[in-house]
Amino acid sequence: MSPLRIGTRGSALATTQTSHVAEALTARSGLAHELVVIRTEGDVTTGSLASLGGTGVFASALRAAVLDGVVDAAVHSLKDLPAAQPETLEIAAVPARADLRDALCARDGLTLATLPEGARVGTGSPRRVAQLKALRPDLELVDIRGNVQTRLARVPGLEQHDDHAPAAVGSPRGDLDAVILACAGLDRLGLDHVITERIDPEVMVPAPGQGALAMEIRAEDESFLGRALLDPEAPVGRLHAALELVDDRDTHVAVTAERALLRRLEAGCAAPIGAVARVGDGEAGAPRIEMTAMVAALDGSRVLRRTSSVQLDPVPADVVGDPAAADEWLEDTLFVAAEALGVHVAEQFVAEGADLLPGTVRGVDRGDGAPRPDDPA
């Protein structure tokens, strides 16, 4: 029986997080796997990400590998995926979310509140830039890119000596007071010790999908899936069954709401937009989905925030006695409610004039007219 081929980018972070997911998949399903490294344009370019012109720069090569049958599934950082999902592909599994917060990595243990006036802070994310300008307009923000080690090397005392993922040769060293990365990526790489502050989402709203991974496969036609159900040992049948075992429904529902917001605003993953949704207990034992979202002008001059929620109805009496039917009803209802919540919050932003803010929707103008993919770290 051939192993499942799992596609991944070649960076240390990508291979580490893909390995974690693939190992969990094997542990739960008993199916062997192999990692297939796919080089993406975002990995090999030496220029600014803006020069690549478009969102999804880290996903396109992986998606092509799935469609061409080079791999059975691809693992993405979900926040790097464009909000519009192609009809030829489906997100079949979203494992449990890691820490979704942004991480300040600063010299001398400094925090966002204790950084001195004029401190130089590096980030490649328009979302982080906009919120930092609103929170600390006295800071000097520096556009950066590169792998995690390259970014950390720009902060005195935080250079990581890793032969497998060294800092880029010739990149600046020690010229910044701090950088902002994602907690999830640092935790997955075992670099949590460089984090001087895990920034509260109420202070800095994370990117939609931050901390979550997506396992994407081909969206097969109904007749093909029907054959898979009839023959669970067929490759596609084994794949679907295995992915169901690593999918975390609450995380999948939450990111569905966050991505629905992006789609309704026609915004790319680079726009200065944040959103975080959670599934919790509501009334009468039924779930409740809550989402906090932020849309900002790129210069931080205006920041719009909204918190909204949707309460699900209890499971109907006609299915409550059938656990399988009740679970199917609940799952369908959760995803429909999540999609509606994301659209609702987006429409509230539009009513407040979010579509008039510079650099919020339909891509981000970085001065050369090219949209800028969000910070991959």
Swiss-Prot record:
The modification S-(dipyrrolylmethanemethyl)cysteine is found at C269. It comes from the Bacteria. The keyword Ligase does not apply. Keywords: Porphyrin biosynthesis, Transferase. Its EC number is 2.5.1.61. Pathway: Porphyrin-containing compound metabolism; protoporphyrin-IX biosynthesis; coproporphyrinogen-III from 5-aminolevulinate: step 2/4. GO terms for biological process: protoporphyrinogen IX biosynthetic process. It catalyses: 4 porphobilinogen + H2O = hydroxymethylbilane + 4 NH4(+). Binds 1 dipyrromethane group covalently. One of its GO terms (cellular component) is cytoplasm. Its cofactor is dipyrromethane. Transmembrane segments: none annotated. Monomer. Belongs to the HMBS family. Tetrapolymerization of the monopyrrole PBG into the hydroxymethylbilane pre-uroporphyrinogen in several discrete steps. The porphobilinogen subunits are added to the dipyrromethane group. This is Porphobilinogen deaminase. The lineage of its organism: Bacteria, Bacillati, Actinomycetota, Actinomycetes, Micrococcales.
